[in-house]
């Protein structure tokens, strides 16, 4: 399987980074400056739309199943 790494050097301010279809996430370091209300609310948040009843989730599930099927054929 080919790997296409994504390197993120910095995320600052009121930023959100969404990473879809990640097999593993290996940060070199994680830090946050706490300022203002809610500043102590830190941590990694993992969300999944696999159980959602919306059409976008159904499309995501179809892509996931297609990837799983492709991987099983490649590794067989």
Curated annotation (Swiss-Prot):
Transmembrane segments: none annotated. It comes from the Bacteria. InterPro entries: Spore_germination_GerPA. Pfam families: gerPA. Belongs to the GerPA/GerPF family. This is Spore germination protein-like protein YdzR. It comes from Bacillus subtilis (strain 168). The gene is ydzR.
């Amino acid at each position: 399987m080919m790997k296409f790494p994504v390197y993120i050097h910095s995320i600052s301010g009121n930023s959100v980074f969404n990473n879809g279809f990640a097999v593993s996430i290996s940060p070199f370091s994680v830090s946050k400056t706490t300022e203002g209300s809610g500043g102590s609310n830190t941590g990694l948040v993992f969300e999944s739309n696999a159980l959602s009843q919306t059409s976008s989730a159904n499309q995501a599930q179809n892509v996931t199943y297609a990837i799983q099927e492709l991987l099983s054929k490649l590794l067989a």
